[in-house]
UniProtKB/Swiss-Prot annotation:
Signal peptide: none annotated. It comes from Schizosaccharomyces pombe (strain 972 / ATCC 24843) (Fission yeast). GO terms for biological process: meiotic cell cycle. This is Meiotically up-regulated protein PB17E12.09. It is found in: Cytoplasm. GO terms for cellular component: cell division site; cell tip; cytoplasm. Residues 92-177 form a coiled coil. It comes from the Eukaryota. Its main location: cytoplasm. Has a role in meiosis and sporulation.
Length: 203
């Protein structure tokens, strides 16, 4: 039984070797010297391809980027197919934005805390010079804090103004449509009145 199994597998191996011969043995077995010369030229020009040889942008575009160790919300895929224009997006953009917002929040909290400490220092000190210095520092902090809040308020006001402008344009557009519809209805009524008058006169 074992001899039969080995024989069958040996025949399969021999058959596959005859169908797909080894490249080197195939070229070496060719009697035509032209084939051998072409093979020598090809092997001389072959060199190892390093990762640095691939353009960085192409690497980003041609590979699917999925890191199983990061937050699933940050996972992104970059796919490139023929005829499709896909833009690579940095998977850490949202994380960085979150860090920036958190830094701003902590910075404002720190400034508020410093202002509170300065208020306590002003009330606790008896030295007029230190008291004036503390007050001045407190004013600068409060001015900076209010400036941050003002900038946010101004940004919200700009967005609100843009929204109002868009709503106004939409209202004007709707008014034009309604006016046009009313004019069409008035013309239809006018034509119907003319037809009725004509029928009355004919009688």
């Amino acid at each position: 039984m074992q001899d039969r199994f080995l024989k069958e597998n040996t025949e399969i191996i021999n058959l596959s070797s005859s169908i797909h011969p080894n490249r080197d043995s195939y070229l070496d077995s060719q009697s035509d010297p032209l084939n051998q010369n072409l093979y020598n030229i090809e092997t001389e020009n072959v060199k190892d391809l390093n990762i640095e040889d691939v353009d960085y942008y192409e690497k980003l575009q041609n590979f699917k980027i999925v890191d199983e160790n990061i937050d699933p919300g940050l996972r992104t895929y970059s796919k490139r197919s023929v005829g499709v224009n896909n833009t690579f997006q940095n998977p850490c953009n949202r994380k960085i934005e979150g860090y920036i917002k958190e830094i701003e929040r902590l910075s404002n909290s720190n400034k508020n805390l410093q202002a509170a400490v300065l208020q306590m220092a002003v009330s606790d000190t008896d030295d007029p010079r230190l008291k004036e210095e503390y007050k001045q520092t407190e004013k600068e902090l409060l001015r900076e804090i209010s400036g941050n809040h003002k900038s946010k308020i101004l940004k919200l006001e700009e967005e609100l103004n843009d929204l109002k402008h868009s709503m106004k344009e939409m209202q004007l557009y709707m008014t034009k449509i309604i006016d046009k519809a009313m004019n069409n209805a008035s013309l239809e009524n006018l034509f119907s009145l003319d037809e009725n008058n004509t029928k009355i006169h004919d009688k």
